[in-house]
A protein has these predicted regions:
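The feature captures the beta-strand-to-loop junction immediately N-terminal to the Walker
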Residues: 61-63
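Conserved ABC transporter NBD signature motif
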Residues: 84-96
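Short coil-to-helix segment of the ABC ATPase nucleotide-binding domain corresponding to the Q-loop/switch region
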Residues: 113-122
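Conserved ABC ATPase "signature" region
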Residues: 131-151, 202-203
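Conserved signature/switch motifs of ABC ATPase nucleotide-binding domains
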Residues: 154, 175
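Conserved ABC ATPase signature
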Residues: 155-159, 163
Length: 284
């Protein structure tokens, strides 16, 4: 006998999932950031508005000095907007918070602590309501996810660049932030290590992609396309603004070997090249 309620239940569940995925994770509203210096006031970014949906991966791309990191720092809470506001998960950002994990290019690991303790310190400072056993389990789980459990007792100075960045990513994920901010995290890595880190990042995101929003700063067009749902192209500073937002309509999961032959990938790649480098073209 067919249960007539099942289609209704499935439809309701699908509606709930779609609604959840459409929720806004980050809202940047008319944000301007200016700094006072010896030569007067320097406006890094001006009148920027952007919404990032829950579960999205969005990259910020542009030339050096276009305000990418400044915009990222307003989301992290380390830079306060001169005008406008940034909202994360429905709350106006007043400063850094555990709902936003950050990974920098320079790893930012404590050199005197082991891999394990670097992650444990972060978990211990955020997860006040957890027991010591629960915290240890969280650290171990995240080390396993980035394949670093055998290296848990090593100091950062004993690790390669790629391994250090995996520690930094594991530390960020261990505190279970709903928003992960990546400021050129793979910029100093060689091409092979960078490629493997992309896969590691997407695996971690995929475990909780309905709840994990990622915003990343990069100079790498290929990286932006491979990882992103949308690419935000910034104009040059000062007074940098958003030049254009490019949708990346490529199915997931993505394979680096196959994706570059996809006509849509080629179209997006050419579009980003045009937006970023047209002014440097040489005419005959």
């Amino acid at each position: 006998m067919v249960n007539v309620e099942e289609p209704v239940l499935y439809a309701a569940l699908a509606t709930d999932i779609i609604t959840e995925l459409k929720q806004t994770s980050i809202e940047i509203k008319d944000v301007t950031v200016s700094f006072k210096g010896a030569k007067g006031v320097y406006t890094a970014i001006k009148d920027i508005s952007l919404e990032v949906k829950k579960g999205e991966i969005v990259t910020l791309i542009g030339h050096s000095g276009c305000g990418k990191s400044t915009l990222m720092n307003t989301i992290s809470g380390m830079v306060k907007p001169t005008r406008g506001e940034v909202i994360a998960n429905g709350n106006v950002i007043k400063g850094p918070g555990p709902d936003r994990g950050i990974v920098f290019q320079n790893y930012s690991l404590l050199p005197w602590l082991s891999v394990y303790k670097n992650i444990y310190e972060a978990v211990d400072s955020v997860m006040k309501d957890k027991t010591a056993a629960e915290k240890r389990a969280m650290v171990q789980s995240n080390l396993e996810m980035v394949n670093l459990l055998p290296h848990k007792d090593k100091l950062p100075g004993q690790l390669s660049g790629g391994m250090k960045q995996r520690v930094a990513i594991a530390r960020a994920f261990a505190i279970n932030p709903s928003i992960l901010l990546l400021d050129e995290p793979f910029g100093a890595l060689d091409a092979l290590t960078k490629g493997s880190m992309h896969i590691e990042l997407l695996k971690l995101w995929n475990l909780d992609k309905r709840n994990k929003t990622i915003v990343m700063v990069t100079h790498d067009i290929e990286e932006a396309i491979f990882l992103s749902d949308r690419v935000v192209v910034m104009n040059d500073g000062p007074e940098a603004t958003i030049k254009e937002i490019v949708n990346v309509n490529l199915p997931r999961p993505r394979n680096k070997k196959d994706i570059t032959h996809d006509p849509e990938y080629v179209r997006i790649h050419d579009k980003l090249l045009s937006l970023l480098f047209n002014k440097f073209s040489i005419e005959d």
